[in-house]
C-alpha cells in the first residue's frame, strides 16, 4: 500500500482506473465524440488495404 501511495503521488494515478490524457477546452467540447474516434482511423486504412486486395482478387 505504501508503494501504491508513493507511485500515485508520482504518476497521479486515477483511483477509478481511467486513462485521462487531456481534456479539450470548453469551446471545443462539441468535438469530443470526434476526438474519441480519431485513434481508430489508422486501423480503417489497414482494413481498407485488405478490402482493396480482396476486390482485385489478391493479385
Curated annotation (Swiss-Prot):
It comes from the Eukaryota. GO terms for biological process: photosynthesis. It is found in: Plastid, Chloroplast thylakoid membrane. The keyword Transmembrane applies. It is a single-pass membrane protein. The chain crosses the membrane at residues 30-50. GO terms for cellular component: chloroplast thylakoid membrane; photosystem II reaction center. HAMAP family: PSII_PsbK. This is Photosystem II reaction center protein K. Belongs to the PsbK family. Pfam families: PsbK. It comes from Chara vulgaris. PSII is composed of 1 copy each of membrane proteins PsbA, PsbB, PsbC, PsbD, PsbE, PsbF, PsbH, PsbI, PsbJ, PsbK, PsbL, PsbM, PsbT, PsbX, PsbY, PsbZ, Psb30/Ycf12, at least 3 peripheral proteins of the oxygen-evolving complex and a large number of cofactors. It forms dimeric complexes. One of the components of the core complex of photosystem II (PSII). PSII is a light-driven water:plastoquinone oxidoreductase that uses light energy to abstract electrons from H(2)O, generating O(2) and a proton gradient subsequently used for ATP formation. It consists of a core antenna complex that captures photons, and an electron transfer chain that converts photonic excitation into a charge separation. Residues 1-22 form a propeptide. Keywords: Chloroplast, Membrane, Photosynthesis, Photosystem II, Plastid, Reaction center, Thylakoid, Transmembrane, Transmembrane helix. InterPro entries: PSII_PsbK (IPR003687), PSII_PsbK_sf (IPR037270).
Amino acid at each position: 500500500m505504501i508503494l501504491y501511495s508513493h507511485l500515485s503521488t508520482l504518476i497521479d494515478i486515477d483511483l477509478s482506473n481511467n486513462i485521462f490524457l487531456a481534456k479539450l477546452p470548453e469551446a471545443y467540447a462539441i468535438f469530443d465524440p470526434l476526438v474519441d474516434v480519431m485513434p481508430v482511423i489508422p486501423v480503417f486504412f489497414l482494413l481498407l488495404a485488405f478490402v482493396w486486395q480482396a476486390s482485385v482478387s489478391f493479385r
